[in-house]
């Protein structure tokens, strides 16, 4: 294996390492799983058709749903969609997916972080969170109803917020977590603020 070089054997060992770690976790030989980055181009194959760890773990544990949850000391960001082309994001933003992710984040904040009543911010999909329907309909037709439904399920969530102003004004500091609609919307500010200290929880 040559560090920094894509090789078939490197990709093969990355998959085998992850597979063995999952097996050990299922058999209760270990209590937790910590992963290192994998190079998607080097591991994707018929054997591993996943876009990253999160969908692989969902399949491996036959989970109904999972959430990509990025955590640092000063900020926590979860995603509704993960590794998708931007052109496909809107079609994957559904009321059901938003509610499901909110429930998962809420559960994690309570169980894993010991927060009794977590406050979760929800970002809009479109610029300025749609400007009340002037720039896209997703906020009015999907995101707001999802927030309302999540609240009825005892999830203390608010939004949708315009992502640029939300992070620029430090509003994220008032919440225990943020739910972003897509990868770059959430991870660009997260990585900028976490400065190398964040992990995919």
Predicted regions, residues:
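Anion-binding alpha/beta catalytic cores of soluble intermediary-metabolism enzymes, centered on
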Residues: 1-138, 143-201
């Amino acid at each position: 294996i040559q560090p920094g070089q894509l090789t078939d054997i490197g990709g093969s060992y990355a998959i085998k390492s992850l597979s063995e770690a999952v097996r050990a976790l299922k058999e209760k030989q270990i209590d937790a799983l910590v992963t290192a980055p994998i190079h998607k181009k080097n591991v994707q194959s018929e054997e591993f058709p996943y876009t990253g760890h999160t969908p692989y773990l969902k399949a491996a544990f036959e989970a109904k749903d999972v959430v990509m949850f990025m955590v640092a000391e000063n900020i926590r960001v979860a995603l509704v969609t993960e590794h998708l082309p931007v052109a496909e994001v809107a079609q994957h933003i559904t009321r059901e997916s938003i509610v499901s992710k909110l429930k998962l984040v809420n559960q994690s904040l309570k169980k894993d972080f010991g927060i009794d009543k977590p406050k979760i911010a929800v970002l809009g999909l479109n610029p300025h969170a749609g400007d009340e329907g002037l720039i896209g309909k997703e906020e009015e037709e999907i995101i707001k109803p999802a927030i309302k439904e999540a609240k009825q399920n005892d999830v203390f969530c608010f939004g949708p917020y315009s992502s640029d102003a939300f992070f620029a004004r430090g509003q994220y500091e008032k919440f225990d977590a943020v739910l972003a609609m897509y990868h770059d919307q959430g991870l660009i500010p997260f990585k900028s603020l976490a400065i190398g200290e964040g992990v995919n929880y």
